[in-house]
Amino acid sequence: MKAKLLVLLCALSATDADTICIGYHANNSTDTVDTVLEKNVTVTHSVNLLEDSHNGKLCRLKGIAPLQLGKCSIAGWILGNPECESLVSKKSWSYIAETPNSENGTCYPGYFADYEELREQLSSVSSFERFEIFPKERSWPKHNVTRGVTASCSHKGKSSFYRNLLWLTEKNGSYPNLSKSYVNNKEKEVLVLWGVHHPSNIEDQKTIYRKENAYVSVVSSNYNRRFTPEIAERPKVRGQAGRINYYWTLLEPGDTIIFEANGNLIAPWHAFALNRGFGSGIITSNASMDECDTKCQTPQGAINSSLPFQNIHPVTIGECPKYVRSTKLRMVTGLRNIPSIQSRGLFGAIAGFIEGGWTGMIDGWYGYHHQNEQGSGYAADQKSTQNAINGITNKVNSVIEKMNTQFTAVGKEFDELEKRMENLNKKVDDGFLDIWTYNAELLVLLENERTLDFHDSNVKNLYEKVKSQLKNNAKEIGNGCFEFYHKCNNECMESVKNGTYDYPKYSEESKLNREKIDGVKLESMGVYQILAIYSTVASSLVLLVSLGAISFWMCSNGSLQCRICI
């Protein structure tokens, strides 16, 4: 009986078996990502795909300074407003920066035809050659070219006029019919500008042009218009009741433009041979110029980023991330960050069967923890970790490469008569923007889900790799761990980790220990049965003795009468 009780105690006492566990890395990261199924999943590592910062400045784009118009508008610059004289020497630029409320535009009031289209054309120009299309001194010998000035275009307190146009007036009491032509021999597009004067009364018409009825004709291969001055009283603007309407055309190489008029012509003086540049553009911004370089400029400021998306501004110039309306686009590269809970012991129970990661394992994503007579320790599985890193890095780079279509996105211009078209364009742009934002967010959600599943799969594969080696030389204890049926020193542990575990070498020892443990279990069951029988018999005897004693007492005091019949 004593021997059986000893076996029972041995079976119930704890044994320090050698163990090896499969686990994953955890750290103190607070990065969170979203997936298709979950929000704010804490992960060990992630990368941000959304740029949301800028420097608030206008910078050189790829080393080339922008054309900063300052207080001048595109119209004031290209016509040559005297207050924009400092811009005359500018020949090349990376982009054009205009302030929202430019003071110096058309100094003499009037309508600028197709102004928004001209802005669109100039937005793709990175340099031009400014030249005299009709030299002032010799092109108009029968007309006055110096008296055509106005107080509305004053410069330094004196009446003046545009630097790229000439106001032709009568000379010696007459204004002869004129005909002037120019052949484009520049081998590139030439921008030609002119104007038509509309006096406020017939007296001004006669004084300036010496005739009541006049016309202006402009003809090229692609342009053909005849203008008749409209003489009428108008409200004064900048002190002028008259108006000048401004026109322009692009002259193709080899083409000819012909001007004919008998009055009211604001003639071209300088024209522009244009050089197109796909990286150029026009932005409207209050940002100041700074000594800085960038690859991407927005009206808000410069962006120096290689990320595929930005939420700073939809208008961009240069090699820029794509604009989306998102506030967060973060792609997971690591694992779920779930450090083990200390109160549950070292080995918790990712991958559906391991509760927490190991902060102690810092040299890899997946690995092992072992415990034997020589001690315990962590070791990363470098092969699976490196394969995962390579796969995820390639995936992130691929996503960035596919989505990082860097481009210039300039705003579109519409005049006041095109409001319906402008509103429609905004709706179309908003629709595309919504689609891009949805695509970007969905892409990140799907890839995050796949990455976390990928990590789970890798941990499971590592677990199965160990399980297939150990077979019945160890038992699963349900928390990502195996308990050996044999002694496993550090050399043995290393063989399990590197996949060279010698199963036959340890199978005999494991078999004996398994049988011993199974035998202890059977003996334990026998002991339990004997104890149960003894306990039942003893309980019955105690019950019978108690009943006999009670009966004897009751008979002796007359409370119970006993009759024995034979």
UniProtKB/Swiss-Prot annotation:
Name of the encoding gene: HA
Gene Ontology molecular functions: host cell surface receptor binding
Stretches in topological domain Extracellular: 18-529
Other noteworthy facts: Major glycoprotein, comprises over 80% of the envelope proteins present in virus particle. The extent of infection into host organism is determined by HA. Influenza viruses bud from the apical surface of polarized epithelial cells (e.g. bronchial epithelial cells) into lumen of lungs and are therefore usually pneumotropic. The reason is that HA is cleaved by tryptase clara which is restricted to lungs. However, HAs of H5 and H7 pantropic avian viruses subtypes can be cleaved by furin and subtilisin-type enzymes, allowing the virus to grow in other organs than lungs.
Protein name listed in UniProt: Hemagglutinin
Secretion signal, residue range per the UniProt entry: 1-17
Family: Belongs to the influenza viruses hemagglutinin family.
Organism of this sequence: Influenza A virus (strain A/Leningrad/1/1954 H1N1)
Keywords noted in UniProt: Clathrin- and caveolin-independent endocytosis of virus by host, Clathrin-mediated endocytosis of virus by host, Disulfide bond, Fusion of virus membrane with host endosomal membrane, Fusion of virus membrane with host membrane, Glycoprotein, Hemagglutinin, Host cell membrane, Host membrane, Host-virus interaction, Lipoprotein, Membrane, Palmitate, Signal, Transmembrane, Transmembrane helix, Viral attachment to host cell, Viral envelope protein, Viral penetration into host cytoplasm, Virion, Virus endocytosis by host, Virus entry into host cell
Subunit record text: Homotrimer of disulfide-linked HA1-HA2. Interacts with human CACNA1C.
